[in-house]
Amino acid sequence: MRGIYQQSYKYFESNVIMSIGAPLANYLSAKRVGNLLYLSGVIAVDPTTRKVINAYDDLPMNAQIQLQTLGYNTGQLSVDIYEAPAASQSWFVLNRIKDIVEAEGGQMKDVFKLVQYFQDLRHYPVYNRVRELFCPESVVSTVVEVSRMLPNDQVLIEVEATAYFN
C-alpha cells in the first residue's frame, strides 16, 4: 500500500480538514460550513511523494481490480498505455474525495455537485465510467476543458466537490 493510504487526516479546532499529507500550496483542501462541505480542486498527486499518479501500478491493488471490472488495466500494453493515465487519475481523485467526505462523517451519496476540469475532453468518457464506481446516482455536474493544471502537464483531471450532510 502506498504512502497516501497510510497518511492520517489532519484536523484543526474548527473541524476543517486541511489535507491528506502536505498541501501543494497554501490553501484549504476542504472546509465545512454547517452541513455543507466544500472541497478544493483535487488532483492525482500523492502528497507524500508529490508524484503525479499516471499508471495502474501507482494505485493500490483494490483500485486496480475495480478498474479491471470496467475494462481498464487489461494487461495489454497497447491499450493500457493510452487509458492508464486518465483511468488511474480518475480513480485516485474520486477516492480522495470519498476519503475526505467520509472523514467528515458523510458518504459519497452526500456529494451533490462536482466541477470537473480536464486538460483534454477526450479523457471525460474514461473519467465518467470510473465516476460510476463512486457516484452511482446522478449529481449536479459541470465539465470544463482547461489548457493547463498545476503542478505540471501530467495532471489531466481536477475535481471540486460539494457535499451536504443531512
Role assignments for model-derived ranges:
Residues 2-166:
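Short, polar/acidic, helix-capping and beta-turn segments at strand->helix junctions
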